[in-house]
Amino acid sequence: MGHPKKPRKQYDTPSHPWNADRIKEENRLANKYGLKNKKEIWKAESRVKRYRRDARIILGMDIDERADKEKELLDHLVRAGFISPNAKLEEVLDLNVEDILRRRLQSLVFKRGLSHTAKEARLFVVHGHITLNGKKINAPGHLVEKADEENIDFYPGSSVAKQFETQETEEVAAEEEPKDEE
């Protein structure tokens, strides 16, 4: 079981430390999603491996045992937003790291336009400027379920929210001025 003060690692490190292709891919992902370090990529990889392993185990079961476990896994992945609602179990084997990284709070803040860059989205989350369902979440790696995706917003009274809104209104006003001159 392990010691309560020392929980088990949630990821596996690469088997070989100096693989140029892997390092380039990890750097690309870190830049695209604004990640702090490679550990965040390795955690996502471990999650993908776990889902794919579960799918392979379920595919190998007898049909009568398989139905409940298949429905349970697919419902979990659909609720999390990793696969589409009408996906089959075989499609779970096509999951990749980017599917997991897209569901992080940090990525969704950037995608919804609440920040200019992915790194800025991380900063907003860590500094407590972002809420999810009205609750302040300060973990950029928090995986957001599909149903909660629309409930991401700035914390009420956040100074960043006020600055961001004034910048947006200034940009909209600047875009409208040339249209009036024509």
From Swiss-Prot:
Example GO BP: translation
Stretches with biased composition (Acidic residues): 167-182
Gene Ontology terms for molecular function: rRNA binding; structural constituent of ribosome
Key words, A-Z: Ribonucleoprotein, Ribosomal protein, RNA-binding, rRNA-binding
A GO CC term assigned to this protein in UniProt: small ribosomal subunit
PROSITE patterns: RIBOSOMAL_S4, S4
Region entry Disordered, spans: 1-23, 158-182
Domain S4 RNA-binding: 103-170
Pfam families hit by this protein: S4
Coiled-coil region: none
Reported function: One of the primary rRNA binding proteins, it binds directly to 16S rRNA where it nucleates assembly of the body of the 30S subunit.
UniProt record similarity statement: Belongs to the universal ribosomal protein uS4 family.
Subunit description: Part of the 30S ribosomal subunit. Contacts protein S5. The interaction surface between S4 and S5 is involved in control of translational fidelity.
Protein name: Small ribosomal subunit protein uS4
Species assigned in the record: Methanosphaera stadtmanae (strain ATCC 43021 / DSM 3091 / JCM 11832 / MCB-3)
Lineage: Archaea, Methanobacteriati, Methanobacteriota, Methanomada group, Methanobacteria
